């Protein structure tokens, strides 16, 4: 598929969003919106946030349990109406009565409720990390609703092999940086900690501690990245979710949407190995590898990230 030169506004500071939305009666009015989702006998509030202008792109953040706002993409908001999901169990969204129900089926159900509420026949869908698991499942279950799919630093499979590889990569990271940053000795324990046994504050502390691992060169650009690190929030309950290991490898040829796979070259957890699996299995998928980038390309290389996404969405099918 051809790429087109795209001019991206280089202002990367996000504009503040109204809460509630400027026009709560319009589902795409800028700001915060709430949808009541029927879940068993309960109605659970699902929050989402609208920013920007242009074609609609729904974005599902990672975790599970990480606050949505790390995924703000102000450069994309210059070209797209971004609809950011605030996943159930986090922030101002509701809480499930049973924490074990924070699983892929639940996240997919709540995502579908938002897309239905938008009243659009189809949308572009972007999923980051765990949000990419949700996006893959949604594109398979609701193919008619997804015009374009952007799978960003994610994987088609988890389970023992996936986590063993992530731990091994984090161990290598710790060895490389142990002399200058002795605190990295605690990082593997943080990655493998039972966050569901902690408070939200404790889970947040773990996430902020291991954050440098998610960057290509955190300490070399610490003045840039430290403010974002300090605003990260982790909610403990979603880590209690139960369900089978995620694995859609055999289903990927059934994805009908145009698909872009984006991956940071140095992503330790959802790196090129997993991105290539998706790229090779999804018919016609494109692969973009962001140089000198870890798991957070929209923060580390925002111009390159935004250019890749906008070029993909503007290119003819």
Q: PLM features: residue spans?
A:
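Short beta-strand/loop motif that positions the catalytic acidic residue
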Residues: 255, 261-263
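Flexible "cap/lid" loop of the alpha/beta hydrolase fold
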Residues: 150-192
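Conserved HGGG/HGGXW glycine-rich cap/lid loop of the alpha/beta-hydrolase fold
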Residues: 39, 43-95, 100
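Alpha/beta-hydrolase
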Residues: 170, 183-250, 257
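Conserved hydrolase catalytic core segment
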Residues: 121-165
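Catalytic active-site module of serine/aspartate enzymes centered on a nucleophile-bearing elbow/loop
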Residues: 285-317
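Active-site loop/oxyanion-hole signature of alpha/beta-hydrolase fold enzymes
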Residues: 84-126, 130, 307
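Acidic catalytic loop of the alpha/beta-hydrolase fold
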Residues: 266-270
């Amino acid at each position: 598929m051809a790429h087109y030169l795209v001019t991206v506004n280089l202002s990367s500071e996000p504009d503040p969003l109204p809460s509630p939305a400027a026009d709560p009666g319009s589902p795409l009015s800028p700001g915060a919106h709430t949808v009541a989702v029927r879940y068993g006998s309960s109605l659970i509030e699902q929050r989402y946030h609208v920013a920007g202008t242009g074609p609609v792109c729904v974005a599902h953040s990672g975790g599970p349990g990480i606050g949505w706002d790390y995924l703000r993409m102000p450069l994309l908001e210059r070209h797209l109406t971004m609809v950011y999901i605030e996943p159930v169990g986090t922030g101002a969204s509701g809480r499930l009565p049973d924490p074990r129900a924070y699983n892929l089926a639940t996240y997919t159900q709540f995502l579908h409720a938002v897309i239905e509420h938008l009243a659009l026949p189809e949308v572009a869908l972007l999923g980051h990390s765990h949000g990419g698991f949700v996006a893959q499942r949604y594109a398979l279950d609701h193919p008619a609703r997804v015009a374009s799919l952007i799978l960003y630093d994610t994987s088609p499979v988890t389970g023992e092999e996936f986590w063993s590889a992530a731990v091994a990569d984090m161990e290598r990271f710790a060895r490389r940086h142990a002399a200058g940053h002795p605190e990295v000795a605690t990082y593997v324990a943080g990655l493998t900690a039972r966050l569901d046994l902690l408070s939200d504050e404790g889970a947040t502390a773990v996430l902020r501690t291991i954050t440098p691992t998610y960057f290509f060169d955190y300490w070399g650009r610490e003045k840039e990245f430290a403010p974002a690190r300090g605003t990260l929030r982790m909610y403990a309950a979603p880590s209690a979710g139960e369900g089978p290991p995620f694995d859609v490898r055999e289903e990927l040829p059934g994805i009908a949407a145009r698909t872009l796979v984006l991956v940071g070259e140095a992503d330790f957890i959802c790196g090129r190995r997993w991105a290539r699996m998706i790229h090779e299995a999804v018919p016609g998928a494109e692969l973009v590898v962001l140089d000198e980038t870890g798991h957070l390309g929209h923060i580390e290389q925002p111009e390159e990230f935004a250019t890749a996404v906008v070029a993909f969405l503007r290119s003819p099918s």
